[in-house]
Amino acid sequence: MEEAASQSLEEDFEGQATHTGPKGVINDWRKFKLESEDGDSIPPSKKEILRQMSSPQSRDDKDSKERMSRKMSIQEYELIHQDKEDEGCLRKYRRQCMQDMHQKLSFGPRYGFVYELETGEQFLETIEKEQKVTTIVVNIYEDGVRGCDALNSSLECLAAEYPMVKFCKIRASNTGAGDRFSSDVLPTLLVYKGGELISNFISVAEQFAEDFFAADVESFLNEYGLLPEREIHDLGQTNTEDEDIE
């Protein structure tokens, strides 16, 4: 009997939350609460109430719908306002919603490291053939030039933090236009999107202190709006993180 009821509940709530309106969000919350509760920790009567509240009803059943609405008002209030019990469930629900939203926004290719471009042809191919939604950051450098090694190290760190951005580096002598990139303009940082150059910074190391790090480069790029929102690696493991969500 319990197995059949469980199967019925699963059929009622099959699929992911897709409601976007206020009523849809409330139904998603009720659904999440019911699914996240242990079967033995919630009375059958309350489980049935939650199931009925989260299940869509036919438009033709107006009388039944109105009766259910009146009947649910007090019972629903009790369920949703069980402070300590519902607080944890609500946090889980919010984290799940953020995770779902994050996954939907995190479409497209992912990289996670700095690509070494060996030739000018490879450089052009990277710019022209990459997806239009992808931001490409290229460091033109030479060994032994001040700031080049520090910038490459910083980009390695940023590539891990922003895997949706393609970070690349190429020696000036390998670009096929080495005469245009003398040591006094290096390192040069070029930013492309959709095959177009959207920002370029020559002698970019001059923007930083003598010793600079990934955080400095990150702040600099963010000033120009060149980086997307940072990746969320772990959604709410601590109470502090949960409170930040609220």
Curated annotation (Swiss-Prot):
Record's comment on post-translational modification: Light-induced changes in cyclic nucleotide levels modulate the phosphorylation of this protein by cAMP kinase.
Compartments it resides in: Cytoplasm, Cytosol; Nucleus; Cell projection, Cilium, Photoreceptor outer segment; Photoreceptor inner segment
Keyword Cytoplasm attributed: yes
Domain (Phosducin): residue spans on this chain: 1-246
Biological process terms in GO annotation: regulation of G protein-coupled receptor signaling pathway; visual perception
UniProt KW keywords: Cell projection, Cilium, Cytoplasm, Nucleus, Phosphoprotein, Sensory transduction, Vision
Record has Repeat as a keyword: no
Residues modified to Phosphoserine: S73
Region (Thioredoxin fold): 111-246
Chain positions covered by the region annotation Disordered: 1-70
Annotated Acidic residues bias: 1-14
InterPro entries: Phosducin (IPR001200), Phosducin-like_reg (IPR051499), Phosducin_N_dom_sf (IPR023196), Phosducin_thioredoxin-like_dom (IPR024253), Thioredoxin-like_sf (IPR036249)
Composition bias type Basic and acidic residues, residue spans: 58-69
Top-level taxon in the UniProt lineage: Eukaryota
Pfam families, A to Z: Phosducin
Gene Ontology CC: one annotated term: photoreceptor inner segment
Subunit description: Interacts with CRX. Forms a complex with the beta and gamma subunits of the GTP-binding protein, transducin.
UniProt record similarity statement: Belongs to the phosducin family.
Biological role: Inhibits the transcriptional activation activity of the cone-rod homeobox CRX. May participate in the regulation of visual phototransduction or in the integration of photoreceptor metabolism.
Cross-referenced PANTHER family: PHOSDUCIN, PHOSDUCIN-LIKE PROTEIN
Protein name: Phosducin
Taxon lineage: Eukaryota, Metazoa, Chordata, Craniata, Vertebrata
